[in-house]
Amino acid sequence: MGQTFHAFMFPWFAFGHMTPYLHLANKLAERGHRITFLIPKKAQKQLEHLNLFPDSIVFHSLTIPHVDGLPAGAETFSDIPMPLWKFLPPAIDLTRDQVEAAVSALSPDLILFDIASWVPEVAKEYRVKSMLYNIISATSIAHDFVPGGELGVPPPGYPSSKLLYRKHDAHALLSFSVYYKRFSHRLITGLMNCDFISIRTCKEIEGKFCEYLERQYHKKVFLTGPMLPEPNKGKPLEDRWSHWLNGFEQGSVVFCALGSQVTLEKDQFQELCLGIELTGLPFFVAVTPPKGAKTIQDALPEGFEERVKDRGVVLGEWVQQPLLLAHPSVGCFLSHCGFGSMWESIMSDCQIVLLPFLADQVLNTRLMTEELKVSVEVQREETGWFSKESLSVAITSVMDQASEIGNLVRRNHSKLKEVLVSDGLLTGYTDKFVDTLENLVSETKRE
């Protein structure tokens, strides 16, 4: 083991960012390092159960300043609907004084951050090294976040001709466009100004995209692996869902989860429900209530609950996704293909059906479907609309034992998972990354 160090972590205030940062913090703490985790107070309460080393990982609360347009009490992106997201980044920027004060008082050796592009300036002022630890895919960073690139257009030399936006993806780019452009500027600025770049991925999945980023930014890109939580270290699956799933045959249940960022229009939500119903398979759906509906039940299609009461559950609340995917009765995962969910799907034994909504999810989906060929994508019309029929066809194509495409993606998925779970591969990424940080900190102290 190298010299122990003290790292600051300042992730973007979204749970899809904070959670993998905390998983990495646990790995660092396991090796004897200290971490100060800078997040809002409310998020601290929601994440503390994931802190496996509370003596080594200390939460440092930040107060979110008031910004016109930001609802009172909002501290993370999950507190506000997408149209209001634009108001939170300026509020996060206003925490800079608090971050500087913490750096001055606690003297970390290293600061890990992702979207707060001013962190390298603070780090340099206090003679601390900065590392941009990115939790979105190298595929999408290389496509949308390189200097001089045009959003939505593959830059020169991009290492894939298959990972492209198509006409029907316009909805994903438009719905996210203003926020995504600002996000893009922040990320590119951070990548250009930080001392080191690291990404939550591995070369077996995204090696050529990581190499492309190294050439674009003239910096070594360090990889941590997927940084998934340790199995069996959290709470078990809730009894009510475990008992419900036990009532179905092995591999027969369709599990649908679209992430906390996706809120469907009511008509599209109903099409989702009807499409899954059309398969005739048992199903478990966990999505946020659609726009204009206070509860999921308010928005369900007429007669739906009565028709599916013995074989379907539709929830508008958070669920234990990794544990549901691991249940023997679950055989298909219908996902938005956020990067965390992408990894969880790969590490599961489920057939994978993808229904992306945001720009990075589209590219993740093309990686899974076109490059790796481990999944199928739900077909959309040019307007971006997906029909109940197209959804049902996609699910049935992978669940039908006689389906050629179903057998192809099953074989490819099985081979890929076999590589990733081979002895020492993913733990090797973690160990090598921690060794790298120890060496970087030691070299910095000798400068």
Swiss-Prot record:
Q: What class of enzyme is it?
A: transferase
Gene3D superfamilies per record: Glycogen Phosphorylase B (3.40.50.2000)
Q: Identify a single GO molecular function assigned to this protein.
A: UDP-glucosyltransferase activity
Report the EC number(s), separated by commas if there are several.
Answer: 2.4.1.-
What SUPFAM superfamilies is this protein classified in?
Answer: UDP-Glycosyltransferase/glycogen phosphorylase (SSF53756)
Name the PROSITE patterns for this protein.
UDPGT
Query: For binding UDP-alpha-D-glucose, which residues are annotated in this chain's numbering?
Result: 260, 319-321, 336-344, 358-361
The UniProt keyword set, sorted, is: Glycosyltransferase, Transferase
Family per similarity comment: Belongs to the UDP-glycosyltransferase family.
- Give the protein's recorded name: UDP-glycosyltransferase 79B10
